[in-house]
Amino acid sequence: MGKINGYIELDGRIQRICSIEDLKRIVNELGKSFTDLTEMELKELTEKSLPDGDEDDCGCKYSENQLWSVVNATNQYKVQEGTKVIHRSAFYYGKYNRGKGRAGKESIENILLPQSLIAIGRKAFRYNIFKNIELPDSVQYIGDEAFMDCDNWECERLSLPMDLRFMGTRAFRNCCKIKTVVFNENIKVIHSMAFQNCTSLEWAYIPNTVEEIGSGIFDGCTNLSHIYISIGSREQFERFFPFDRDKLTEIEKTKI
């Protein structure tokens, strides 16, 4: 096995790497720092002012491990490996530009996201007409209206990222093709109207690890028949869903 001998700057400190153990320690420190970020800190990562940065072959702008804006992507666009944040409104174009788009955005059908991604900003994909996108398990934060009005998205079963902790207001509002939603055990906060008017939605699973659920997350979901919850958590969820108690069904996650 080749020797390791080098230096890395981490949080303003120069650290020497002489062994696999040194490398593992630094990776663990990085993982811990991102896991420990609060909802507000994750949001702030996506809300910074646009700095100078590098553009890729499509003219899409990157800086500080963030994707800031998508300018002229083609049918399929792969977000650069190592990108940790998709900035607010990066893929967004307004309601009245649909079918025309801004500098080619209307042509993106497939979007590939890297496993390094931890935060998706406010309105990052709103009104986008992509057909396919998969959310990597590394994503911890999905901002307000991030996927709102993405009614061209061919997603029927939405399995949310394993590391997802925070979901913003109206994050998936009007995503009319989603039929089922599965949250994983790291989820802490689901803000209000997250799935409002997802008219094809039939059921959702939410584990008892959730600490806060805003009002009306399933308002307008006219086909919703079941809200599946963890075994033994009915009392907890009756507080979250006082008007939908009849839809609450305790179930083992392995059976959905």
Regions found by a protein language model. Name each.
Residues 18-20, 24-31, 46:
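Residue-level detector of alpha-helical secondary structure
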Residues 92:
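Acidic-aromatic substrate-binding/catalytic surfaces of carbohydrate-active enzymes
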Residues 6-9, 14-17, 33-34:
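Short linear proline/tyrosine/threonine-rich motifs used for host-factor recruitment
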Residues 241:
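DNA-binding interface regions
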Residues 2, 12, 35-61, 65-85, ...:
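Structural signature of tandem-repeat unit edges
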Residues 89, 121-124, 143-146, 168-171, ...:
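Consensus positions within tandem repeat domains that build extended binding/scaffold surfaces
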Residues 15, 55-57, 147, 152, ...:
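Mature extracytoplasmic/luminal segments of secretory-pathway proteins
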